[in-house]
Regions:
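Beta->alpha loop/short-helix hinge microenvironment recognizer with preference
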Residues: 1-294
């Protein structure tokens, strides 16, 4: 996925929905497509408003998480958005200001409209109630922007493969009960919860996606080749792409052939690539530096 990205600061935004809507997505998981579509339309329209003739198009990646910190059903979408877009004429326009009032209200309007189209007239009463109780739109917030390539790649690794619960949050299992902890979202207070093993499993399996359902989706210039994409600078240069691909193939081949992981340290930790040094063209020399992630 990192091969798709352009070398630009990116913004991490999170699009959330009110609690009274969550049950609809739980009963009919096809509605999760509406969540993706509402986010897509909102972001593209925000950039299009800058200059309709140019129709600036950003690159963004949407990742659906259906879980909250306490493992409850809480569908929301994390988005990595380039701080800029490619235009019909201008190769790239930097966009630093994101109008969050627009994002909140537009996302609310589009999602409720899409849900009404899918659910039917019975949804109108819920829709009216939500507009009354959510006058400022749905909650959309942004974390600090990712200003360099390393920050963007760290984000990719952290959110794209994020499990429902990390093993480090499971404190105890005695054969019958599981104790896990989390920081409560409202005040970051540490909460410890003990549930039966069966209930713990139930909390986990509700987050298993339907077969063939895509939890990660690419939009804008990351979805397909834009006519000005050849003028943009990629996050990872082509020379490094080839080497990284061969490095991954090398690890996989050794593992399946000999059952060993070549980058697993004798201390038990997995080593990671720090840097790749390239010399000349084509690639004639490379140095692979590893360090323990401990």
């Amino acid at each position: 996925m990192s091969f798709k990205l352009v070398s630009s600061p990116h913004r991490h935004c999170v699009f959330t929905i009110p609690q009274e809507l969550r049950i609809f997505f739980r009963k009919d998981r096809n509605l999760l497509n509406c969540l993706f579509d509402a986010v897509r339309q909102t972001i593209l329209y925000m950039f299009r408003k800058i200059n309709k003739a140019e129709n600036f198009t950003p690159g963004f990646v949407c990742v659906l998480h259906t879980f909250g910190r306490s493992l409850q059903w809480n569908p929301h979408i994390h988005v990595l958005i380039s701080e800029g877009g490619a235009g019909n004429i201008t190769p790239w326009r930097v966009v630093k200001h994101f109008n969050f009032n627009f994002l909140r209200n537009s996302f609310q309007m589009l999602l409720l409209k899409l849900l009404e189209q899918q659910i039917g007239p019975s949804f109108k009463k819920i829709k009216a109630s939500i507009y009354k109780n959510q006058e400022n739109g749905f909650y959309v917030y942004a974390k600090p922007n990712l200003t360099n390539n390393k920050s963007v790649l760290d984000y990719i690794g952290r959110y794209l493969g994020r499990p429902v619960i990390a093993s480090s949050r499971i404190d105890k299992y005695d054969g019958n009960f599981v104790t896990f902890h989390y920081n409560r979202h409202e005040d970051e207070k540490l909460i410890s919860e003990t549930v039966s093993a069966w209930n713990f499993i139930k909390k986990l399996i509700i987050h298993i996606p339907e077969k063939h359902f895509k939890m990660i989706r690419y939009y804008g210039i990351y979805a397909k080749k834009h006519k000005n994409s050849h003028k943009l600078f990629p996050l990872i240069k082509k020379e490094k792409r080839r080497f990284l691909a061969s490095l991954n193939a090398w690890k996989t081949s050794l593992f399946f052939s000999f059952g060993c992981d070549p980058i697993k340290c004798t201390c038990g930790h997995t080593m990671s690539v720090l840097e790749i040094f390239l010399k000349g063209s084509p690639l004639i020399h490379s140095i692979r530096k590893f360090t323990s992630s401990a």
